[in-house]
Amino acid sequence: MIKILYEGFSLVELIIVMVLIGILAAVAVPKMGNTITSGEEASENGVLAALESAVEMYAMDQVVSNSSRRYPYNPFDHMEKTPQGYSGENSVLDEDGEWTFENGQWIAHQRNDNSRYKWSYDSNTGQFGDRVAY
């Protein structure tokens, strides 16, 4: 008599593997979301640092040329390279990754998840405020 061997996985084994994959995915997805948020915050911090540097360089140039410390109205105008997504002054944030300078006092950014943040900017003192969701 010939023995027939069935090779492969049983239905129970396949279900157990699917459950384990589901558990791993449930743990990994929230951590991945936190990583994306952290990356966007780091990118925003980099842009703000570049803006602060551009504002200070402008102020130092003003001291040298005019003997008075003045700050630019729009800090984006004096950056070496504007950030990707900068759409100009007083534009509507309607695209992911977009930056704008609003009403002469706010720097605004829309993240890829459509959340929006802004920082105050005082052109009299060159000071930037903290990140605020809006």
Feature locations, PLM:
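N-terminal single-pass transmembrane signal-anchor helix
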Residues: 3-35
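Short helix-capping and hinge/turn segments at secondary-structure transitions, especially at repeat
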Residues: 29, 34-37, 56, 60, ...
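Conserved interaction-surface patches within small, structured recognition/assembly domains
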Residues: 34-39, 70-72
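Membrane-proximal N-terminal amphipathic helix
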Residues: 39-65
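Extracellular/periplasmic head regions of type IV pilus-like filament subunits
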Residues: 60-117
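Low-complexity, S/T/G/P-rich flexible repeat/linker segments used as non-globular hinges
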Residues: 116-134
